[in-house]
Each structure stands twice: as structure tokens, then as C-alpha cells.
A protein has these predicted regions:
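Sterically constrained small-residue positions within well-ordered secondary structures
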Residues: 17, 67, 131, 150, ...
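Residue-level signal for beta-strand positions within conserved beta-sheet cores that form or flank
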Residues: 22, 155, 200, 264-266, ...
Length: 509
């Protein structure tokens, strides 16, 4: 009997190794976050860090690279296998090695950028998108700014095209299409991007300063096809610092605006978004009278918006418009007991379905929301949960949903080939964790566009013992089957006549 137990444990360990190896293959375009900068500018090789996400977890690697992220600006993109291709801190563009990209990648066309090569202190000041229908090219949209005597408004939205096939696969900035001015006006800080309903083109948006007007760029296979504006009929954005953010399903949009005549007050502004027409529809603004809203992020299921002030984290339920206080800063300092406060700043919905929150100070910890699809404190917010062993300020990647395809529920915009994420067979990115487990486990998955799914669990005889519907746009579920006996089961996800299965091992001491 003892020998049998050893055999079972050995089999489980072997299966864990196999499952881990498989999960490592579940990488993608938005699976990298670069952290750290050079605290000592005379030592350009200070240790930094990189977080690589798979669909259910992450790994942190500390290493040295040239490009720092001392400010609040970060754009990066990886290939389909999760290999980092390029990044930008708003001042310059780096290749996959972290060194300067070929062909004058420095974005130094104004004095502010020239003086901040370690990274711009502007939130969401750039973003990277794939060039429509051209898998060899990418487009970096980025800000330019100058001090106006009060703050740093943005004076243009620019873009640069990168050809990843140049310089032996390290990429190069296009010699003609670099620092191209898309729009010249006065803007607030922040750029957001969302895939068009046709599944190929992109919307890129930014706020006009001291107004309620939003600019919308439609970027197609021929470059900029149109630039339009829309009045949103909301409190005007005045020297705004906001994470302009689209929901994972592309149907909602959020930003915050500061109210200058009401100190420490903000509005959270939410909208419906039509990916075909580019039109925004305004919801009722949510007033927050307890501080300036810094960070914003949607939950994976697009139902909740998380918003944070310096010392408070809120959850806004878009189904009810109810604002709930999730947490208050607990007073923890990093990296020393006397410095520095790990307060709240920018939010980031990562590829593993969790939300991470940075701090505006130079600290060595980040916060984590483990279950952002859950209501209230069940979201499980853990302050300073993750040590990163390097100094990092507030920057998080400005990743649009690269996996958002054609909206097949509408007939106005025909589906077009993207050349970026078109596959004949759907990749469900299905994972189970922990595995083995005691009957309580988490599944992560990616359903086909606008489609619901079904989870089924079968015993070794092929008998279905559990079945659950999976809503469209959901990506994570917590399953509790405490009555399952020890053994090996088959878990299957199906949608649109396609499916994927994983082995589930139940083992109770």
C-alpha cells in the first residue's frame, strides 16, 4: 500500500511537470511587463526586472538592460509566443534586447523628452499596435509635451512605424514614417486603443484639454483613414492625468476627470462604445469626493471598474453603478521601514486575469487583485503582495486587447482579415490550477469572439459528472467539487463546435 502511494505521488509530480511545461507555452502579445530604472544614473546597469505572464500565473526575472522606466509611460509588445519584440518609455524605443532600436529611435523632439531619457512622467503617453494586415510592422502612438508654466499638457499625437524584419529581426524605425504628427492640438495626457469591429483596423483616442471633447483616429491598412471628434457631455477634462481604458470586450470605456473647484474630488466617467462607428454613449458620472483618481482598470469580464486614489481602492459595478470601497492603504513602506509609502497609483489588467497596482514612489513591491471578477472584498486585494527586488515607480504597460476580433453580432461592418491573430482553429488557452488539487480549482480560458462556452468534467469511464455554462467574454471561473474522489478526470471546454480538454488530478491527503 505504501508503494502504491509512492507511485501515485510520483505520477502526480510527473504530471505537474508536464502541465507546467504546457502552461509555459501559453504566452502572447501582452504577456510582458518591464520594471525598474537606474537609481544611480552613473551606473546604467542597475538591476531591473521583467514579469512574464502566462494564462494563470507569472514569473519575475531580475536582470540588466539599457532601457529604464523611471516615469509612468510604458508601451511594449511581444510576438504570439510571448517573446518581447520592442518597448518604449516615451522618450525612446528599445528592441528586444532592451537597447536602442535602429534608425534614430529617440523621440527627442522637445525639451521635456530630451531631459527625461529614463522615461516620461506621463500616464499612458504611448501605446503599440500591430499594423493592420501587415504582420511585419507595428505602430507606436506617442505624445509630445512641454511645460506651460503650470503643468505638462500634450501638444500633439504622433506615430512612428516599426518594421520588425529589419536589423536581423530586432526591428528598425521607418525612416519616413517616424514622429509623424497625427493631430496637433492641446490634449490631456493619455492614449487608448481598441480594435475596430471589422477585426482588422484600430481606433486610437485622446482627450482635448479643458473640454469634454474626445479625438478619434481610425488607423487602417493605408494609415490614418480619418480623424474625428465627439463631445461627450460630461465634466470637462482639465490637466487630466488618467488611464484612458477600453474594456476587454471593447464595449465600454472609462476615464476620470479632476474637478478643479472641488479639491480632492473626481468623476469616474464610463461610456458604451460602438466599435463599428466609433461613437461613445455616456453613462451617469460617478462622483468621488475622497481624493484624486489615479488608476483605472476593468475586470476581465468587463463588469467592474477598479479605481484608486492615493490611499483608497474602489470597485464600480457597471450593472448597478454602485461604488464600493475595497481597501485603504495599510501604511506599509518599501524598501525600508521608514520609506517609502506603498500607496496606490496605476492599475494593470494582466494576461493572467489579475489586476496589479503600482505606486507613484520608487518602491520594491506591487499590489495584486487576485479575483477581479468577484464582487466587493471577494476580489481579494492583497497590498504589497509581490516583491520585485528592484526600484520601480508607476509605469504599467498600455496594452489594448490584441485578441479582440471581429464583432460577429453586428452586420454594419464586415469582418476583414487582420494578418495578426487569424487562426483556423481557436486556441482556448485552457488551464487548470492548482493541478493536482482537492476538488477546488481555478480554470482560465479564452472563448471565441462573442461566444459562450460549456465546461464539462468526465470520469475515467467517460461519464459526465459536472457541467457548467461559461458566459461570453468570461476568462476565469472558480470550481468547487469537494465530493470528487481521488483520481484522474477529463475537463473539456467547448464552444462553436470546437473544444479543448485537460487532465484534472484530484488528490486528497
Amino acid at each position: 500500500m505504501k508503494r502504491f502511494g509512492i507511485l501515485i505521488r510520483g505520477s502526480i509530480i510527473l504530471l505537474q511537470i508536464i502541465l507546467f511545461a504546457n502552461s509555459c507555452l501559453s504566452q502572447g502579445y501582452n504577456h510582458t511587463w518591464l520594471l525598474g530604472y537606474h537609481p544611480n544614473v552613473n551606473n546604467p546597469f542597475d538591476t531591473m526586472a521583467q514579469i512574464d505572464f502566462n494564462i494563470s500565473s507569472f514569473s519575475i526575472v531580475n536582470y540588466q538592460r539599457k532601457i529604464p522606466f523611471r516615469g509612468f509611460t510604458q508601451a511594449n509588445i511581444s510576438d504570439a509566443n510571448g517573446n518581447l519584440l520592442m518597448s518604449s518609455n516615451g522618450a525612446w524605443i528599445a528592441n528586444s534586447t532592451g537597447d536602442t532600436m535602429m534608425n534614430r529611435s529617440f523621440l527627442g523632439y522637445d525639451s521635456y523628452i530630451n531631459a527625461n531619457a529614463q522615461g516620461l512622467s506621463l500616464v499612458y503617453a504611448n501605446t503599440l499596435i500591430p499594423y493592420p494586415a501587415d504582420s511585419s510592422k507595428y505602430v507606436l502612438f506617442h505624445h509630445s509635451t512641454e511645460y506651460d508654466g503650470f503643468s505638462y499638457p500634450v501638444y500633439s499625437i504622433n506615430y512612428s512605424v516599426i518594421d520588425i524584419t529589419k536589423d536581423g529581426g530586432l526591428g528598425a524605425v521607418d525612416s519616413v514614417q517616424k514622429y509623424v504628427t497625427a493631430i496637433q492640438d492641446t490634449f490631456n495626457c493619455g492614449i487608448a486603443a481598441c480594435r475596430h469591429a471589422n477585426g482588422r483596423d484600430w481606433w486610437v483616442v485622446a482627450q482635448k484639454h479643458d473640454t469634454d471633447t474626445i479625438y478619434k483616429i481610425l488607423f487602417t491598412t493605408n494609415g490614418i483613414a480619418s480623424v474625428t471628434t465627439q463631445k461627450l457631455n460630461v465634466p470637462k477634462a482639465w490637466y487630466n492625468v488618467s488611464q484612458l481604458t477600453f474594456s476587454p470586450d471593447g464595449k465600454k470605456f472609462v476615464y476620470q476627470t479632476y474637478i478643479p473647484n472641488q479639491p480632492d474630488s473626481s468623476y469616474i466617467l464610463t461610456f458604451d462604445f460602438d466599435r463599428c462607428s466609433g461613437l461613445f454613449t455616456t453613462h451617469n458620472p460617478v462622483f468621488v469626493n475622497r481624493g484624486y483618481i489615479w488608476g483605472l482598470a476593468f475586470s476581465p469580464n468587463s463588469q467592474f471598474v477598479y479605481a484608486c486614489t492615493t490611499d483608497k481602492l474602489y470597485q464600480l459595478d457597471l450593472n448597478t453603478n454602485n461604488l464600493d470601497t475595497i481597501a485603504t492603504y495599510d501604511g506599509f513602506n518599501s524598501p525600508y521601514t521608514w520609506c517609502c509609502p506603498t500607496t496606490f497609483f496605476n492599475c494593470y489588467l494582466a494576461a493572467n486575469g489579475k489586476i496589479y497596482i503600482t505606486c507613484g514612489n520608487a518602491i520594491q513591491h506591487i499590489h495584486e487583485i487576485n479575483y477581479p471578477d468577484s464582487t466587493g472584498t471577494a476580489c481579494d486585494f492583497q497590498q504589497h503582495a509581490i516583491p520585485i527586488d528592484c526600484y520601480h515607480r508607476g509605469s504599467v504597460p498600455n496594452h489594448p486587447n490584441y485578441y479582440l476580433g471581429c464583432d460577429t453580432t453586428q452586420t454594419t461592418c464586415p469582418c476583414l482579415i487582420t494578418g495578426f491573430n487569424d487562426v483556423k482553429q481557436h486556441d482556448f488557452k485552457f488551464s487548470i490550477s492548482p493541478n493536482p488539487n482537492n476538488g477546488n480549482f481555478k480554470i482560465m480560458y479564452l472563448l471565441p469572439q462573442n461566444s459562450k462556452g460549456i465546461l464539462e468534467v468526465f470520469d475515467i469511464n467517460g461519464k459526465a459528472i459536472y457541467k457548467q455554462n461559461l458566459p461570453p467574454w468570461s476568462t476565469m471561473q472558480y470550481i468547487s467539487l469537494p465530493k470528487l474522489a481521488n483520481g484522474v478526470y477529463n475537463c473539456t471546454i467547448t464552444s462553436n463546435n470546437e473544444g479543448m480538454h485537460k487532465k484534472l488530478v484530484v488528490f486528497k491527503e
